[in-house]
Amino acid sequence: MEDQETRQNREYWFVVFAAILYGTITAGGQFFSNLGLSLYEISFYPVLFVSLILLPIVWTKRQYFIKKEMILFFVSYGLIGAFLELTQFGGIVLGVPVAIVAILLYSQPIWTTILGKLMFGELITNRKILAVSLAFLGIIFLLKPWHIESVGPITGIISALFGGLFLSLWVVWGRKSGIDKKHFITTTFGYKSFSAIWLLLLWPIVGFFIHKPNIVRLSISFPSQYWFYLLIFAVISALVPHLFFYRGIQKVHASIAGIILLLEPVSAAILAAILFAQAISFNLISGGALILFSNYLVLHEK
């Protein structure tokens, strides 16, 4: 019994570690944006690199290969991933302030708690409700939306709201892969490879509606060091955290994982302070403390 509890605690910490590493996504996105890469390039190339890195492993180790009965699952999961990439940036493109977009994206634990109940029968306890409420309050403290004069167009708001829903679906599909006992390497490869395919298929459609090169350009004419930076970014922000996340969520409920993942903006804010000399404010400290406390609540729920 003690060994089982130890193993379960280990799975929780796998998700915590993944959430912290996911915080590099924001800092990396800002870094590559400063270099002049488009949003589509920042989204697509790391996804492609993760797929290519794992391809030899999946190809030579047949136990990791995507079996025929898994294809439909990964086709749908990849589509969720592609829509997540597009909707999380769609609000910003359409003129919604970043703080509002982030708040709507991080409504994810609310959706995840509901979907976890509907799909997996996960209990919605008072402790979970309190943890979600504290975490969401922490996000509001982090982002300070009261400083914003306008929330932007309704189309951008809807896009960001759907981004939160697709982020939740990403967590829920990840949990389903764990319940179905798919290996975490298989899930990482399947999710990323099918997301890359869907991003390519959707690219001309997105380009039809959005004509800004800094959004939809997909070029290979980069200096060689940019490719190296993209490779490192893919490993740190996607490959490693995905492997830990999909390993952990084999045992961790989707609703709990959704709350733990709110450590990501705390990690992102700290990285921004270190890498881009952004100030560590009272709002960051208080918001981060609320999110950490919400994680304490779910990690110690009996």
Question: What kind of feature is each model-predicted range?
Answer:
Residues 9-14, 40-56, 72, 133-134, ...:
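Hydrophobic alpha-helical transmembrane segments of multi-pass integral membrane proteins
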Residues 2, 47, 145, 226, ...:
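C-terminal-most transmembrane helix of multi-pass membrane proteins
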Residues 23, 27, 78, 82-86, ...:
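Hydrophobic/small/kink-forming positions within alpha-helical transmembrane segments
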Residues 54, 75, 79, 127-145, ...:
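Hydrophobic transmembrane alpha-helices of multi-pass small-molecule transport proteins
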Residues 21-26, 59-99, 141, 234-252:
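Specific transmembrane alpha-helical segments of multi-pass solute transporters/efflux pumps
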Residues 53, 58-59, 108-133, 266-285:
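C-terminal transmembrane-helix exit sites in multi-pass transporters
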